[in-house]
A protein has these predicted regions:
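Amphipathic alpha-helical interface elements
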Residues: 1-183
Length: 183
């Protein structure tokens, strides 16, 4: 029996994310992972939104209300699209990403403050079938620290899960809309 299209799409997303992140080290690894999560959240939110009438929709551009990674996380949580442990993991990654992006030095995932944030969320993600399947493959990759391996596993698991969830969504359909005149 062949896997269903959703499983294949999630597997392809996971592979792409893992390959992208394994090509990076240090700051690049964290920034690429967080950027990929930001994009996955945008896909999830757009999947439940009515399409924009404006072909040049700027709702998700950096200077707009949903332009930040944090705003996307919060909205996805408030809409019930992600559960609390996923929200916590995304915020932990956001905090690490912010530290890496604004550090003048050479930050590493081994630093205690980053480990403290991430160690809170790893136990929730580790039982994921995707994490379990990818962990041995990453362990065989030379040059990656244990912290980098765990971070890649977390981000890959999250991106694949969020993208798969986005594929299952349909646009929100309100029972009524606000109008100036009744129809």
């Amino acid at each position: 029996m062949s896997p269903d299209p959703l499983t294949l799409a999630a597997a392809e997303q996971a592979r792409n994310v893992a390959v992208q992140m394994m090509a990076e080290r240090g700051r690049g690894l964290v920034l690429v992972g967080a950027a990929r999560l930001d994009l996955a959240l945008e896909h999830l939110l757009k999947a439940v939104m009515a399409p924009s009438a404006d072909p040049d929709d700027k709702l998700f551009t950096p200077d707009r209300s949903l332009g930040s990674y944090g705003a996307k996380i919060s909205l996805a949580a408030r809409l019930g699209l992600i559960e609390a442990p996923i929200e916590q993991a995304l915020h932990a990654i956001r905090s690490v990403r912010n530290d890496f992006a604004h550090s003048a030095g050479e930050p590493t995932l081994a630093e205690p403050r980053h480990q403290k944030r991430l160690q809170r969320v790893y136990p929730e993600a580790e039982p994921s079938p995707l994490w379990i399947a990818l962990a041995p493959l990453l362990q065989s990759q030379s040059g990656l620290t244990a912290q980098e391996q765990s971070f890649i596993l977390l981000v890959t698991t999250l991106v694949a899960s969020i993208e798969a969830c986005a594929l299952l969504q349909t646009p929100f359909s309100p029972r009524a809309t606000v109008r100036f005149r009744s129809r």
